[in-house]
């Protein structure tokens, strides 16, 4: 039987699974939506002998599979024992964003009940917690546009045409709003002087030249960047060697508007290379 590369797309309803499935389908994956997990081993056998057989398969699994979720560990073990390469992409978003998306689309939550959408989301998190713990990648779509999410998924799976380079996301965030899920490296830059307490700089962000000059001009910041760049010079090739295709570097300060933004922007361009695709995201820069 032909061995498949299998990507299981799972996660919270409204977190971007449909966008991810469409992106993989456009990249040549054979995509199946809402396949009961218990049928996965048999499906892979049938697919291997079919006229549409290909080596790349993606399956969307979520709470619509509720009756079949309990045996996921046994099913995954069976699939892997057959020689298939399995990655689990878990899509998530903060509750406030999920609630807003449901309000905007007016769609019914799969676990919809009289207690409301918030309670349905809570129950969904509980049901999918075990699968999340086993996931290969956790993708937080809270602050990503559909286009950004699609690009991220494609980079994770395919890299680009230059020998599948390492796709790096450098993102800033505010500890006030929580550490981004799916972060591989997290750096806390709250040890640096805060532009928030400089009246002229407070209304600006780390994207402005004044704030960037203030933050990057600090001796402590220059030393930090020098040490961190040396660490990345060691880590990035090591991640590539181990077969990692996507790396998320998260830089945090108190509110995610000044220090972390300035440093993330600097790093985004400092670590550019022919064997990497580097993108940037400022999760909390627009928040007050």
Swiss-Prot record:
Top-level taxonomic group: Bacteria
Q: Which UniProt keywords apply?
A: ATP-binding, GTP-binding, Nucleotide-binding
Tell me the function of this protein. Displays ATPase and GTPase activities.
* Keyword Nucleotide-binding part of the UniProt annotation: yes
Checking Pfam families in the record gives: PapZ_C, RapZ-like_N
Which terms in the Gene Ontology molecular function aspect does this entry carry? ATP binding; GTP binding
Q: Which residues bind GTP?
A: 62-65
Tell me which residues bind ATP: 11-18
Record-linked InterPro entries? P-loop_NTPase, RapZ-like, RapZ-like_N, RapZ_C
NCBIfam families the UniProt entry points to: PRK05416.1 (NF003828)
Q: Quote the protein name from its UniProt record.
A: Nucleotide-binding protein Pcar_1935
Q: Which organism is it from?
A: Syntrophotalea carbinolica (strain DSM 2380 / NBRC 103641 / GraBd1) (Pelobacter carbinolicus)
Family of the protein in this entry: Belongs to the RapZ-like family.
């Amino acid at each position: 039987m032909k061995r498949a590369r299998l990507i299981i797309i799972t996660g919270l309803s409204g977190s971007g699974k449909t966008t991810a499935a469409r992106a993989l389908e456009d990249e040549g994956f054979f995509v199946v939506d809402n396949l009961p997990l218990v049928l996965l081993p048999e499906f892979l056998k049938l697919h291997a002998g079919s006229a549409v057989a290909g080596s790349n398969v993606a399956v969307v699994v979520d709470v619509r599979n509720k009756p079949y979720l309990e045996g996921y560990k046994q099913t995954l073990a069976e699939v892997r024992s057959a020689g298939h390469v399995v990655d689990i992409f878990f899509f998530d978003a903060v509750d406030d964003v999920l609630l807003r998306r449901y309000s905007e689309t007016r769609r019914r939550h799969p676990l919809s009940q009289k207690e409301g959408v918030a309670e349905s989301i809570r129950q969904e998190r509980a049901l999918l917690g075990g699968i999340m713990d086993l996931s290969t990648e956790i993708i937080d779509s809270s602050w990503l546009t559909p286009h950004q999410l699609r690009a991220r998924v494609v980079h994770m799976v395919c890299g680009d045409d230059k020998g599948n380079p390492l796709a790096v996301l450098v993102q800033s965030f505010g500890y006030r709003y929580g550490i981004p899920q799916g972060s591989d490296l997290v750096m806390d830059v709250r040890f640096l002087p805060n532009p928030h307490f400089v009246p002229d700089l407070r209304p600006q962000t780390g994207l402005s030249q004044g704030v960037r000059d203030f933050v990057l001009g600090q001796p402590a910041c220059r030393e930090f960047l020098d040490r961190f760049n040396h660490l990345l010079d060691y880590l990035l090739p090591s991640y590539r060697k181990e077969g990692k295709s996507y790396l998320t570097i998260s830089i945090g300060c108190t509110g995610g508007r000044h220090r972390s933004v300035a440093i993330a922007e600097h790093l985004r361009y400092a670590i550019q290379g022919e064997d990497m695709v580097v993108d940037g995201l400022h999760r909390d820069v627009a928040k007050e």
